UniProtKB/Swiss-Prot annotation:
SUPFAM superfamilies: P-loop containing nucleoside triphosphate hydrolases, TrpR-like. Residues 332-453 are annotated as: Domain IV, binds dsDNA. Plays an essential role in the initiation and regulation of chromosomal replication. ATP-DnaA binds to the origin of replication (oriC) to initiate formation of the DNA replication initiation complex once per cell cycle. Binds the DnaA box (a 9 base pair repeat at the origin) and separates the double-stranded (ds)DNA. Forms a right-handed helical filament on oriC DNA; dsDNA binds to the exterior of the filament while single-stranded (ss)DNA is stabiized in the filament's interior. Residues 115-331 are annotated as: Domain III, AAA+ region. Belongs to the DnaA family. It catalyses: ATP + H2O = ADP + phosphate + H(+). It holds the Pfam family Bac_DnaA_C. CDD domains: AAA (cd00009), Bac_DnaA_C (cd06571). ATP binds at G159, G161, K162, T163. One of its GO terms (cellular component) is plasma membrane. Domain I is involved in oligomerization and binding regulators, domain II is flexibile and of varying length in different bacteria, domain III forms the AAA+ region, while domain IV binds dsDNA. InterPro entries: AAA+_ATPase (IPR003593), Chromosome_initiator_DnaA (IPR001957), Chromosome_initiator_DnaA-like (IPR020591), Chromosome_initiator_DnaA_CS (IPR018312), DnaA_C (IPR013159), DnaA_dom (IPR013317), DnaA_N_dom (IPR024633), DnaA_N_sf (IPR038454). The lineage of its organism: Bacteria, Bacillati, Bacillota, Bacilli, Bacillales. This is Chromosomal replication initiator protein DnaA. It comes from Staphylococcus aureus (strain NCTC 8325 / PS 47).
Amino acid sequence: MSEKEIWEKVLEIAQEKLSAVSYSTFLKDTELYTIKDGEAIVLSSIPFNANWLNQQYAEIIQAILFDVVGYEVKPHFITTEELANYSNNETATPKETTKPSTETTEDNHVLGREQFNAHNTFDTFVIGPGNRFPHAASLAVAEAPAKAYNPLFIYGGVGLGKTHLMHAIGHHVLDNNPDAKVIYTSSEKFTNEFIKSIRDNEGEAFRERYRNIDVLLIDDIQFIQNKVQTQEEFFYTFNELHQNNKQIVISSDRPPKEIAQLEDRLRSRFEWGLIVDITPPDYETRMAILQKKIEEEKLDIPPEALNYIANQIQSNIRELEGALTRLLAYSQLLGKPITTELTAEALKDIIQAPKSKKITIQDIQKIVGQYYNVRIEDFSAKKRTKSIAYPRQIAMYLSRELTDFSLPKIGEEFGGRDHTTVIHAHEKISKDLKEDPIFKQEVENLEKEIRNV
């Protein structure tokens, strides 16, 4: 693939993973200049954006690049102005343009601090009511790996600080023991490496790499749902590490019991230690995050502008910091001082037309389950008793009506059921709605509640 084709694919995947605001503000107009010696040089016309992408999104883009090109590539975002210096350096010291060898890639799986964002430490983590317990648990684990809580399972929505805490744990462990072997990875990357090890007949090297360590930090574990072989491999990796008193830290967007198509033996192991959840920051925490950010960056922003951002952006920390960066870029490009009016103008696309919360199948299962007294896990179970089967059909019907997910995807979230089962459920509930006005009112009430989640 050409650089253009590679980056088009990266942007396509990134658009699905990032919020619309983050994608359009920071990543949309970037361009891949070259890939050389395991590094992807990516151009951004705005200095603020280049710095922000290196700090906050390099890890996500690195994982996507791995999926697209099939080997480890570290993204480095530079401005178009910096490109001249880069080109001069390349001319002075020409480098070989070969793909990294397998040996180099494998050796780089344990990279110490290079795995972690230098900014993501416990010192830079702003504590508030929504994250105080996860922070305390993470610090306890970092102080005494495998002695406090093992595993530590952190869950919460996107951009709330789960990855920050995992990086902070990694930094702290290495502060106390520079020789510790620490791996930070995502379950998606773990899966891709596992598949590659099978393809290249390198299973033993893969197992050695992940089992001969002191701390495993694995992000977004929900990605392994429905991946039977990956779950089995991770099960044995988990057992090996746990039995040898090695620390395991796991993050997810939902608690273990709500991860569909996760083997019971893995689910139970995830629940062995401590499960903590991170919730969106309150106003005071949002203000503290913004104030800390401007102190770190030595920025001069009036308090009323920060107050406006903190009041308007309530979803997560990533969106909050993204709004601040957007404001700085807007002010710089227009050459105008930052005021409340300019802040409102810079963020008008976010504020005036907020993207409504996307309804998930998990939202539907939760509301329907509460109404009919059905546990979340029962929606994925094989049970066919009417007290469970009928609410399951209602949830399938609502999933088709209220989401854009495909029939196979809906079936997957209900225990891996075939798409024809979803069609049958939709047809049956549609028929019952026409025949029973009381039932119709019941389902309409459920729909309203789901839309208000």
